[in-house]
Amino acid sequence: LCYKSRPSIGDIDGSKDVPSEIDYNLWLGPAPKKPLTRNRLHYDWHWMWDYGNGDLGNQGIHQMDIARWFLGDMEVSPRVWSIGGRLGYVDDGESANTQVIYHDYETAPLIFEVRGLGDVKGSGKRPTYRGGSVAVFVECEKGWAAIRNYGSVQIYDNDDKKIKEFKGGGDHFGNFIQAVRSRNPKDLNAEILEGHLSS
């Protein structure tokens, strides 16, 4: 799940001038050559269909990586459905800020939810589920696992009693930098294919 309260990206009339230090043609790459129609060029691209896919692709791929590792699936799900929309305000954003995605893996379903609005209108406070707002939860017959950060996993029984905790060996950002510096892909903790499958 990805429950991150995201404010409106604003609603501008017409188009905006691209900063003179930006080669906009290079920035766009293969995307359609359209005028800039949002306030922040360098971050709000996440919410435009030509360049991004909202929090599903911005934050969600990290949680889906972890969920797939639990499933043991090294492939794209054979079937997927999604429902959602851009709710709560009218702005220049296009991609969904509220969305549920169902991956129909053979092992077990992987369900991902995006909530880009606060838990109470205007509060900006993140909603939570089982103590997590950006997390992975694995439901099993005799209990469940919670991954609420990138450094640990807690295991609970069906009465929500914590029975075990595992600590990780470090963050993946540092590992990526280390692999770039060594120029050795074998230094990566995970193959690049992992990110591709989740995205």
Where are these regions (language model features)?
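Contiguous beta-strand/loop segments that form the cofactor/metal-binding neighborhood of enzyme cores
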Residues: 2-54, 58-199
